[in-house]
UniProtKB/Swiss-Prot annotation:
Residues 7-163 form the PPIase cyclophilin-type domain. This is Peptidyl-prolyl cis-trans isomerase A. The modification Phosphoserine is found at residue 77. Belongs to the cyclophilin-type PPIase family. PPIase A subfamily. The modification N6-acetyllysine is found at residues 28, 44, 76, 82, 125, 133. The modification N-acetylvaline is found at residue 2.
Amino acid sequence: MVNPIVFFDIAVDGEPLGRVSFDLFADKVPKTAENFRALSTGEKGFGYKGSCFHRIIPGFMCQGGDFTRHNGTGGKSIYGEKFDDENFILKHTGPGILSMANAGPNTNGSQFFICTAKTEWLDGKHVVFGMVKEGMNIVEAMERFGSRNGKTSKKITIADCGQI
């Protein structure tokens, strides 16, 4: 089985910043990877296109995926509002790791984060399901618009997204 690759075209206050592509580990976490893939294509009628990264903490991570409330309190999965933690096989080993944000055990929706550092304290709590393939420089550029409390100085959006 070939793992899917998806892309985000990132914009800052509406101006193009660049493309980030992700390898999704469907061989290890098929349900979680499929959720992210389908939300990236928008094939279920909803998804990431036009949504923002509402929380960016330099030296930690960039969080997005709340396409319903745009502030970190919303989002939904392709399986319903929430779905269970699939497994914790993959670890938060360093920059570029793609992992599910949650509000405790078995509360995965659509929110995710891209690590910009090793975050081993999240192992066993958040499901890792992908990795930046290309465009880590774009993720690093996004980081510059973040702050210690996560508030962004400019609006960082997913202007377009899909599967490669």
